[in-house]
Amino acid sequence: STKNGRDSNPKYLGVKTCHAQFVTAGSILVRQRGSKFHHGQNVGVAK
């Protein structure tokens, strides 16, 4: 047996909207770990 014989599921992180794209309320803009991209005015942050 080996010590590195496991793999995690993909987390699908990153930016989810394109430049100048119209979005509706409640849509996901970025999925990230930590706060690499900081939220701006009228943007909420969820866990």
Curated annotation (Swiss-Prot):
What's a GO cellular component annotated to this UniProt protein?
chloroplast
Q: Record's Pfam families? A: Ribosomal_L27 (PF01016)
Q: Does the keyword Secreted apply?
A: no
Family annotation (PROSITE patterns): RIBOSOMAL_L27
Task: Offer an example of a GO molecular function term for this protein.
Answer: structural constituent of ribosome
- An individual GO BP term: translation
Alphabetically ordered keywords of this record: Chloroplast, Plastid, Ribonucleoprotein, Ribosomal protein
Give the UniProt subcellular location, in the record's own words: Plastid, Chloroplast
Q: Which PANTHER family match?
A: LARGE RIBOSOMAL SUBUNIT PROTEIN BL27M (PTHR15893:SF0), RIBOSOMAL PROTEIN L27 (PTHR15893)
**What family does the Swiss-Prot or TrEMBL record give for this protein?**
Belongs to the bacterial ribosomal protein bL27 family.
Name by which UniProt lists this protein? Large ribosomal subunit protein bL27c-2
List the taxonomic lineage.
Eukaryota, Rhodophyta, Bangiophyceae, Cyanidiales, Cyanidiaceae
The coding gene here is rpl27
